[in-house]
Amino acid sequence: MPKVIFLPNEDFCPEGMVVDAATGDNLLEVAHNAGVEIHHACDGSCACTTCHVIVREGFDSLNETSDQEEDMLDKAWGLEMDSRLSCQCVVGNEDLVVEIPKYNLNHANEAAH
């Protein structure tokens, strides 16, 4: 069973956290189930970048990025080579080390009322 190690982040996970995950789990759901509140303005529909994370270790064990995710990642603040949208990440067989960036951008569009 792979482990997900969330690096310390003063806003989301001040002490850092290590949680168990199953192969095939969604990374955003793993975080939320563990009490790590990663923002997700679009409810995980790959329409914003608020759930942007940087996968410091285990990146290659994740599912491949879709064209839609790559397009959204181009808009993410602090984009790095190992950046992913946590709502689109499927946990593989390896442990992950995940950094939650200090800042994010919300590109979700809401209909005017």
UniProtKB/Swiss-Prot annotation:
Give one Pfam hit by family name. Answer: Fer2
Residue ranges of the 2Fe-2S ferredoxin-type domain? 2-104
Cofactors named for this entry: [2Fe-2S] cluster
Recorded GO molecular functions are:
2 iron, 2 sulfur cluster binding; electron transfer activity; metal ion binding
Which residues does UniProt call coiled coil?
Answer: none
Bound cofactor: record note: Binds 1 [2Fe-2S] cluster.
Disulfide bridges in this chain = none
UniProt superkingdom:
Bacteria
Q: Which InterPro entries match?
A: 2Fe-2S_ferredoxin-like_sf, 2Fe-2S_ferredoxin-type, Adrenodoxin-like, Adrenodoxin_Fe-S_BS, Beta-grasp_dom_sf, Fdx_isc
Q: Name one GO cellular component term.
A: cytosol
Keyword Ribosomal protein in the entry? The reply is no
**Which keywords does this chain's UniProt record carry?**
2Fe-2S, Electron transport, Iron, Iron-sulfur, Metal-binding, Transport
Annotated [2Fe-2S] cluster binding lies at: 42, 48, 51, 87
What's a single GO BP term from this record?
electron transport chain
What PANTHER family does the record point to?
Answer: FERREDOXIN-2, MITOCHONDRIAL, FERREDOXIN/ADRENODOXIN
User: Which family does the UniProt entry place this protein in?
Assistant: Belongs to the adrenodoxin/putidaredoxin family.
Question: What job does this protein perform?
Answer: Ferredoxin are iron-sulfur proteins that transfer electrons in a wide variety of metabolic reactions.
- Name of the protein: 2Fe-2S ferredoxin
Organism, scientific name: Haemophilus influenzae (strain ATCC 51907 / DSM 11121 / KW20 / Rd)
